[in-house]
């Protein structure tokens, strides 16, 4: 958080640094240095929606589903348990660096195993907090694997190898 605070203050400090550089005293007998180039604003950061895009692969066979509300999360979880469906729940957050690192792996797995839906759940979504503590989600990324309506596996952290092997095991059970 301190880094973000420092980064937020950076644009306010840049004009001060430019003014200090421009106010250097003139020394006779020495050529004046060329004036610094005008300050330009940094390029904008990509939008969070682009960083966490869940657009299906070009073949259109992705099984990634973004859970949009606490109500839909509860509904999906109930359906998976009641109908004994295979599923993966991917608990993530937009501010999570390891989650961003795992995004391409998850995208690849959702295309490789289209019969296993992957439900992407943002832990910062309103109304989800109590459900997450009931499920013992304490860090992200966390992946829960369901088979025949019950949780059969869990991967915590950005461990691509373990994630792929657990997904393969779930696929073999189908």
Curated annotation (Swiss-Prot):
Has the keyword Transit peptide been applied to this entry? yes
GO cellular component terms given for this protein: mitochondrion
**Coiled coil spans:** none
Site Contributes to redox potential value: give positions: 97-98
UniProt keyword terms in alphabetical order: Disulfide bond, Electron transport, Mitochondrion, Redox-active center, Transit peptide, Transport
Q: Which cysteines are joined by disulfide bonds?
A: 96-99
The record ties this protein, via InterPro entries, to: Thioredoxin-like_sf, Thioredoxin_domain
Location of this chain's protein in the cell: Mitochondrion
Q: Which CDD domains match?
A: TRX_family
Describe the location of the Thioredoxin domain by residue ranges: 60-172
Q: Where is the transit peptide?
A: 1-59
**What residues make up the catalytic site?**
96 (nucleophile), 99 (nucleophile)
**Is Transport set as a keyword in this record?**
yes
- Its chief place of residence is mitochondrion
**Gene3D superfamilies linked:** Glutaredoxin (3.40.30.10)
Q: Which residues form the signal peptide?
A: none
Known function:
Probable thiol-disulfide oxidoreductase that may participate in various redox reactions.
| Protein family per UniProt | Belongs to the thioredoxin family. Plant O-type subfamily.
What name goes with this protein? Thioredoxin O, mitochondrial
């Amino acid at each position: 958080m301190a880094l973000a605070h420092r980064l937020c203050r950076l644009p306010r400090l840049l004009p001060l640094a430019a003014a200090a550089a421009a106010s250097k005293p003139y020394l006779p007998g020495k050529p004046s240095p060329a004036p610094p180039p005008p300050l330009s604003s940094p390029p904008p950061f990509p939008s969070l929606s682009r960083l966490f895009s869940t657009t299906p692969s070009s073949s259109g066979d992705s099984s990634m589903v973004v859970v949009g509300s606490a109500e839909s999360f509860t509904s999906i979880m109930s359906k998976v348990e009641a109908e004994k469906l295979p599923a993966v729940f991917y608990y993530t957050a937009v501010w999570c660096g390891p989650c961003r690192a795992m995004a391409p792996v998850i995208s690849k797995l959702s295309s490789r195993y289209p019969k296993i839906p992957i439900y992407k759940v943002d832990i910062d979504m309103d109304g989800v907090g109590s459900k997450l503590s009931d499920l013992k989600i304490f860090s992200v990324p966390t992946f829960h694997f369901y088979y025949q309506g019950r949780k059969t596996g869990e991967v915590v952290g950005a461990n691509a190898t373990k994630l792929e092997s657990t997904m393969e095991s779930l696929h073999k059970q189908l």
